[in-house]
């Protein structure tokens, strides 16, 4: 896949079908962050005492989902992992710049 094709495929996903299926990235990632936080505090109460992170933000979720894709890329070269990574990075950038 050429870089323009990867970016276009990511644009189609994050600006079309994914948003229609799951809502805006900001809202969806905020919900994911809340659920991850609840899970981590319940599953690992010792972390809650030593970590200052009380809230996983939408930007955090987008960044960590990007890292998940990086881990997948490290073990294979599926085109959709690169497309998804581009999409998560774009969402993280949009969320971060909207916060400023």
Where are these regions (language model features)?
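Intrinsically disordered, low-complexity regulatory regions
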Residues: 1-100
